[in-house]
């Protein structure tokens, strides 16, 4: 079986890492994968290529509309690979996958199309204008895929309320390797030395990229309240807040209780 995954880009992110984890866990010789990144190379590209999976880049620039040449290249890439399944990832990838399948087999519809939605939809106005239009377009085209895969019941409910066809809904929660994400005393001690904080300090972590949907504003307000409360009661307890993720910098706050660690791969 030949499967194409189409995704916006391959920089570090939740969807990108889940794509990598999915590919790394499927070692069946009967499966042949191709990944298409609508933009350029990212930090996850080499990890996927190391699995023996080919990655094609369309080199779109962020915010730009695709030219006819780019659309035709996408169509040709899909036709040349001749897949059984095309899987879109997130709004841009879903629409691109839909266009690719339609142009590759407009009559026979021999390619099975699936969408993958990996976020909640509290307030679309906080999304970029292009993304908002793609969300609306996705509502109109939601009859097209065989299934729409969501990673949470809440995400499915919100998108169905926004007009996505509910009968297409499939829910597959995120999976995590508990052998990797487990307590490690040696790493724990080494990490505290790196941060130069005491063994008794309480560490509170927040891991996510900078995006209105992640609501760093509320978390920062909560930090201010905690710090203020500890000061008011004269507590000597040290509480350190670790903010980790792409775009999360000290421009957000000058609170000395906050450590901005940027993007990390050793969570």
Model-found features: residue ranges?
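Membrane-interface segments of envelope glycosyltransferases acting on lipid-linked substrates or membrane lipids
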Residues: 1-267
């Amino acid at each position: 079986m030949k499967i194409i995954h189409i995704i916006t880009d391959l920089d570090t992110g939740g969807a990108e890492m889940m794509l990598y984890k999915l590919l790394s866990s499927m070692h069946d010789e009967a499966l042949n994968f191709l990944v298409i990144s609508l933009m350029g190379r990212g930090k996850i590209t080499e990890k996927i290529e190391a699995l023996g999976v080919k990655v094609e880049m369309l080199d779109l620039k962020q915010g730009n509309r695709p030219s006819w040449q780019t659309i035709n290249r996408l169509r040709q890439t899909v036709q040349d690979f001749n897949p059984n399944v095309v899987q879109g990832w997130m709004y841009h990838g879903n629409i691109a996958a839909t266009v690719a399948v339609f142009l590759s087999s407009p009559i026979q519809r021999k390619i099975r199309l699936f969408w993958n939605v990996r976020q909640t939809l509290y307030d679309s106005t906080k999304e970029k204008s292009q993304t908002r239009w793609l969300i609306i377009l996705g509502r109109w085209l939601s009859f097209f895929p065989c299934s729409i895969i969501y990673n949470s019941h809440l995400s499915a409910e919100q998108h169905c309320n926004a007009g996505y066809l509910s009968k297409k809904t499939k829910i597959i929660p995120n999976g995590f390797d508990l052998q990797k994400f487990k307590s490690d005393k040696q790493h724990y001690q080494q990490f505290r030395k790196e941060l130069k904080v005491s063994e008794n300090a309480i560490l509170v972590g927040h891991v996510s990229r900078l995006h209105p949907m992640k609501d760093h504003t509320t978390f920062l307000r909560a930090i201010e309240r905690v710090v203020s409360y500890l000061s008011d009661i004269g507590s000597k307890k040290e509480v350190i807040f670790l903010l980790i993720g792409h775009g999360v910098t000290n421009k957000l706050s000058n609170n000395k209780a906050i450590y901005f660690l940027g993007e990390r791969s050793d969570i």
